[in-house]
Design a protein with these regions (language model features):
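Bacterial Sec-dependent signal peptides at the C-terminal "C-region" and cleavage site
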Residues: 14-22
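Acidic Gly/Asp/Thr-rich repetitive segments characteristic of extracellular carbohydrate-active
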Residues: 25-60
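Extracellular beta-strand-rich solenoid/capping regions of secreted or surface-exposed proteins
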Residues: 43, 47-52, 68-103, 112-131, ...
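Ser/Thr/Gly-rich low-complexity blocks that favor extended beta-strand/coil architectures
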Residues: 113, 162-208, 355-394
Length: 602
């Protein structure tokens, strides 16, 4: 009798957990708003569900509420994540792996993480959707303080530490700490207290974290000289580590992220690599609204796509308070380290935060770049075979032995500086109807040869350049050249209030070319900028380097006096090695003087 009762209860539990093609996670013991550790329960539930799902579409439902995730009992994974610190293992809150035709619906839930964790991973999936939830950390690794007094003569600042920040004064140093981590910050970003915009002309600042004294509860007196930090200014103390993004995608096909808000992550909001066809629909990296006491979101980019293909569609998002771009799209050059024979090279990932993940597959089309001039050398080729040269397989590898279908140009070897670019893993991009505001560094960055459309966005006080087209085989080794870019119907409001890398104008076309004078061809091409509105307090609107084919037409440039002009570039247009330029039918406050407003260099 007792056995029958147990079996009956088990059947009821299983029926409750999966009903009508839907898995209700409450059937796996998950309960909202308890403060209890959800990590082991969700890990077990997702593992069981992954083993059961077939080709039919299923939904995984998380009852609405707050769920807390701790490192204890979390899924442990060894992930090598592009543009992040390669420390392992990663402790994953929700690990979606090898799933097909799955919809995860958080139903408005808040996922709150503790310590140092990777909140969500989606790996090896096909036709999956994640939607309706937010990601945050109870104690972010960024420390926020508010300036109370600034003695500019004595070089002393008194500041108050935000109530959620955990810290101690150790040997007269401010040390931020949390569950399983601590750091002594040296750098920060200053925000206006009332607007949450970056303070004008401050950029990255040193912070008063050394030789300090706690003069009252959470009130610190520090030797710190910076006259721009008036009382009421909010400063975030940050580091430059980026162990994990908020959402990690790898080897996924046809993915949708819908109505998701990332309020904080220690790395990027989203990092997707080697994935195909990604839709972001109202995916945001944002504060919790106007009344959120925080001024920051992520430690790095809001969204980042490395070595992806198909279509990246990002629409309807809000990106604010992050420490870098709202979106960055690129591939990765391998540096040629050895020529084995006329068809075989050894290529290597060169940046310490970008290695360990798959680079290419047999059949992929590639081309070769001379790094100093960023010119294509020889003809396109195809990968015949590829294997890791320094690891048993590609997992964790830095070097790859690549055999090509056709002989490689004899000039390409370890003698010189050459890069290998994978043209197969390059996406089209549609970035539209987004708001990008009050962030550090830049608004957006695109480096793909496929069609890129940037339209109907608002770039509001992005602090540096609003849109950057790059390409770099010398530092980050991020590919590649743009050949079909349409920037239209966007509004740009007071970009360039600060100076950061590549911020030569509101729109900056800035490939890294160490030996520009020796370059014979052009890197970028096919760029059209039209029907946009620019509101600016300064002069530079468009900077371009090494471009063949650039159109700037039907744009409106309105001048204001919101800040003093200070940029070193005092030309509306500054061109270096740019040909086939068309500037016409634009409206400028105060008129346009071609001789004065255009600077062109060969």
């Amino acid at each position: 009798m007792k056995l029958n009762s147990v079996l009956t209860l088990l059947f009821i539990a299983l029926f409750t957990a999966c009903k009508g093609g839907a898995y209700d996670l409450s059937g796996y013991g998950l309960k909202p708003d308890t403060g209890e550790n959800a990590s082991p329960l969700i890990a077990k539930a997702l593992q069981e569900i992954a083993a059961e799902v077939n080709s039919d579409t299923v939904r995984i439902l998380l009852p609405k509420g707050r769920y807390d995730f701790y490192p204890e009992g979390a899924s442990k994974r060894e992930y090598f994540i592009s543009n992040h610190d390669q420390d392992n293992p990663k402790l994953v809150g929700l690990a979606f792996e090898n799933m097909k035709n799955v919809i995860f619906d958080g139903q408005g839930s808040e996922l709150v993480f503790h310590g140092r964790m990777l909140p969500v991973s989606l790996v090896g999936s096909e036709n999956c959707t994640l939607k309706n939830f937010s990601i945050d950390f109870a104690n972010p690794h960024i420390s926020q303080v508010k300036v109370l007094e600034n003695d500019t003569v004595g070089g002393l600042i008194t500041y108050e530490v935000a109530p959620w920040v955990e810290y101690e004064i150790r040997d007269s140093n401010f040390v931020a700490k949390g569950e399983g981590w601590e750091h002594a910050p040296a750098w920060g970003i200053a925000f206006e207290g009332d607007t949450k915009r970056l303070v004008y002309a401050t950029s990255d600042i040193s912070v008063g974290s050394k030789h300090v004294a706690e003069i009252a509860s959470r009130k610190i007196l520090a030797p710190w000289k910076n006259k721009k930090l008036i009382p009421g200014t909010v400063v975030v103390f940050r580091g430059y580590g980026r162990p994990t993004p908020g959402v990690f995608m790898y080897h996924d096909t046809n993915t949708t992220l819908e109505n998701i808000q990332v309020h904080y992550a220690e790395g990027m909001g989203l990092l997707a690599q080697m994935s195909e066809n990604i839709t972001l629909d109202k995916f945001s990296v944002c504060l919790r609204g106007k009344d959120d006491p925080r001024y920051f979101t992520t430690q790095a980019d809001a969204t980042h796509f490395s070595g992806c293909k198909g279509l990246i569609r990002s629409v309807g998002g809000l990106y604010e308070g992050m420490m870098d771009d709202a979106i960055n799209v690129h591939g990765t050059y391998l540096k040629v380290q050895k020529r084995i024979d006329n068809k075989t090279l050894v290529g290597e990932y060169m940046h310490g935060q970008s290695y360990g993940f798959e680079w290419g597959r047999p059949g992929d089309v590639v081309q070769f770049i001379e790094s100093k001039t960023m010119e294509v050398l020889g003809e396109q080729n195809k990968v015949a075979a590829i294997e890791a040269a320094d690891k048993p397989d590609g997992h964790g590898a830095k070097q790859f032995r690549i055999t090509f279908e056709k002989p490689v140009d004899p000039a390409i070897s370890e003698v010189g500086t050459y890069g290998i670019e994978n043209l197969e893993w390059t996406p089209e991009v549609y970035f539209a109807d987004n708001v990008i505001r009050n962030n550090r560094a830049r608004g957006s960055l695109f480096s793909t040869p496929k069609k890129t459309v940037v339209e109907k966005n608002v770039f509001d006080h992005t602090s540096g350049t609003a849109i950057l087209l790059c390409g770099d085989c010398n530092g980050w080794f991020e590919t590649g050249a743009c050949h079909d870019v349409h920037i239209r119907n966007n509004k740009f409001i007071n970009a360039l209030t600060n100076q950061f890398q590549f911020t030569n104008a509101v729109i900056s076309i800035y490939p890294e070319i160490p030996d520009l004078k020796s370059q014979k061809r052009y890197f970028h091409s096919g760029i059209v900028i039209e029907d946009n509105e620019f509101e600016t307090f300064d002069m530079p609107i468009l900077y371009a380097k090494s471009v063949d084919g650039l159109v700037f037409r039907n744009n409106v440039i309105r001048q204001n006096h919101d800040y003093p002009a200070f940029h070193w570039n005092n030309h509306r247009f500054f061109f270096q090695r740019v040909v086939n330029v068309e500037i016409k039918d634009n409206r400028f406050d105060g008129g346009f003087d071609e001789e004065k407003d255009i600077r062109s260099e060969e």
